[in-house]
From Swiss-Prot:
Recorded GO MF terms: transferase activity; zinc ion binding
Documented EC number(s): 2.3.2.36
Pathway as given in its UniProt record: Protein modification; protein ubiquitination
Phylogenetic lineage: Eukaryota, Fungi, Dikarya, Ascomycota, Pezizomycotina
Residues reported to bind Zn(2+) 1: C408, C411, C454, C457
Peroxisomal matrix side stretches: 1-148, 223-246, 315-341
Protein name: Peroxisome assembly protein 2
């Protein structure tokens, strides 16, 4: 090749040829840090002739690993960036679609508004415009943006609770004033709210509401409940950057309706109730007034419901009166952040969960058994300490060992619960007299001590211990069983004293007509009975004491009545026996 031939290389000063991006390597290989100085490729020497040094080999391996790590890192970064770009593009497309849909909706709404505006009816135009405005408000992203609806409702509830609290305190203060109760009390008698508090209940409510209105709304443009919620009454008729307080006539009308209006309405309803006494029906005029009153109450309730629903939507006027007077509750400053503390709520939830846990666990644990075990351990420890102090001597005695046998110790403890050991010792030293309330009923004997209790008392205590034993109140033994009492009631025999006066038995016929001969026989018979009583020491006959003053007229026969013939025969035989005895007595002194 001659020197004049053009060379394939680029001319001096010419621009370098640009390589397209598609042909470029996205991951260019870094230059070799140890380039071969000889560009001519030569065969590799054999290991035996020229062995490679080990240091150079490790350096090449480290470079290769670093190169592969860099390549992986670059690939991961490129993939993450590509995914982020895809997400951004998807969001942009969704936003554009939503904007297009919103624009289409606005166009349709504008066409609907144009049709409504072109309508010839003013009522239809007004209703259509209001409906479309309400729909736009509900479907917009901002919504109605109410000013603390919950806070306004809570403020009203707090105000009512405050009035009820003050009314209850006034009732308690006037509870014992004018206890007679008056005629208009309605028969309350003696309880809370009777007397003056019940007769003047409407006036008391009027005074309380008037005082609260003066100290809250009239002076500070906010009730106590609204102040706790950081709210104040404002005049909604005035537009401006700053909130304007309500005017004096607005507050005056508000107080006149809330205080005086409630009082007058309550008195009006009471008067209507008084006209119906229950015996005779009310007059036609009163019936007509009652119907009008009921209709007015229904109308007011319906209007209040509609107003409250609108309040839930917009959050401007809490009550119907606020809407009529154009007074609304609003925070005084917009810079104050509404901070809600959940400390009380969290504490309440924790205690509620803890109580539920205890109610679930205690029946499984058996708290009564543990309590009985601790009480038994304490009694044993106390008994051991007492025995050591006394030197280990003495019999087993319970805390009610001083009671008589006929007294149930369980009934006595239930009715005379002693608060200390000193009272028990005083009762033991002073003596206890049983009563019908503490006497044993249906006696049962405890096993093994044998102490006697009422069946119901003893069986209840044993069953309550669930087989672990119940300590006897008389001796301290552990009782697990009981049985019916096998004892008897013993009565001491009463010794009859000898009669101090003379007694005799007569028949009814003899009492009616006594003769002289019979009187002599009776005297002789009395003498003989007196001698026999002195010799034998007791009489074997049933005698009736004779009345020395009244004779035998007051006597009553104790023998069965007999006929007159039997009476004559018996009287004759008795007279013969007496004569024989007299003859024998007369012959004895002579012999």
């Amino acid at each position: 090749m001659s020197d004049s031939d053009p060379k394939p290389t680029a001319a001096k000063g010419a621009a370098p040829t640009s390589i397209p991006n598609s042909t470029r390597n996205p991951n260019p290989t870094p230059p070799n840090p140890n380039p071969n100085p000889n560009p001519i490729s030569t065969p590799a020497p054999t290991p035996t002739a020229t062995p490679s040094p080990p240091i150079a080999s490790s350096s090449n391996n480290g470079n290769n690993s670093t190169r592969s790590t860099n390549i992986d890192t670059n690939n991961n970064t490129n993939n993450a960036f590509f995914q982020a770009q895809q997400r951004i593009a998807a969001r942009r497309e969704a936003r554009e679609a939503a904007a297009a849909a919103r624009q289409a909706t606005q166009q349709s709404a504008s066409r609907l508004r144009a049709r409504i505006a072109a309508s010839q009816s003013p009522l239809l135009r007004r209703l259509g415009t209001s409906t479309l405005s309400l729909w736009d408000t509900l479907t917009s992203r901002e919504g109605t943006r109410p000013a603390f609806r919950v806070g306004q409702v809570d403020a009203e509830l707090l105000d009512e609770e405050l009035v009820e609290l003050l009314r209850g305190q006034v009732r308690e203060a006037l509870r014992y004033v004018g206890g007679g109760g008056g005629g208009g009390g309605g028969g309350g008698g003696g309880g809370v709210g009777s007397g003056v508090a019940q007769d003047w209940e409407a006036e008391i409510s009027l005074a309380l509401r008037a005082v609260l209105f003066k100290l809250t709304v009239w002076d500070h443009d906010a009730t106590y409940g609204a102040a706790l919620q950081n709210l104040k009454y404002t005049d909604a008729r005035r537009d401006g950057p700053a909130l304007a307080p309500p005017s004096r006539w607005q507050k005056a009308l508000y107080g006149l309706v809330t205080v005086g209006g409630r009082y007058l309405w309550a008195k009006w309803e009471d008067w209507l109730l008084e006209q119906d006494d229950g015996f005779e029906g009310p007059s036609p005029r009163v019936k007509r007034l009652a119907r009008w009153t009921s209709a007015l109450s229904t109308l007011h309730a319906s209007a209040a419901l509609v107003s409250f629903l609108v309040f839930l939507l917009h959050g401007r006027y809490r009550t119907l009166l606020d809407r009529l007077l154009r007074m609304r509750l609003a925070p005084p400053t917009s810079q104050v952040s509404r901070e809600v503390s959940f400390e009380y709520l969290n504490r309440q939830l924790v205690w509620h969960a803890f109580t539920e846990f205890l109610l679930f666990v205690l029946p499984l644990v058996g708290i009564n058994r543990w309590r009985r075990w601790l009480a038994r351990t304490w009694r044993r420890t106390k008994k051991i300490m007492t025995a050591d102090a006394d030197g280990g001597a003495g019999d087993k005695k319970g805390e009610y060992s001083f009671l008589p046998e006929r007294t149930c110790a369980i009934c006595y403890r239930d009715q005379n619960s002693a608060s200390s050991e000193t009272e028990l010792l005083a009762a033991a030293s002073g003596g206890v007299v049983g009563s019908a309330q503490t006497d044993i009923t249906n006696p049962y004997e405890a096993i093994p001590c044998g102490c006697t209790y009422c069946f119901v008392c003893l069986a209840t205590r044993i069953e309550r211990e669930e087989g672990e034993g119940w300590p006897c109140l008389r001796c301290g033994e552990l009782i697990k069983e009981c049985k019916p009492w096998n004892g008897d009631v013993l009565e001491e025999p009463q010794v009859k004293s000898s009669p101090a006066t003379t007694k005799t038995v007569v028949f009814a016929d003899d009492v009616k007509a006594p003769s002289d001969h019979e009187e002599e026989e009776n005297e002789e018979e009395e003498e003989q009975q007196g001698e026999l009583g002195e010799n034998e020491g007791e009489s074997s006959q049933v005698l009736v004491e004779a009345d020395p003053d009244g004779g035998l007229n007051d006597l009553r026969p104790e023998t069965p009545s007999v006929s007159s013939d039997q009476a004559d025969d018996s009287r004759g035989s008795e007279s013969e026996d007496y004569e024989a005895e007299e003859d024998g007595l007369d012959e004895d002194p002579e012999s």
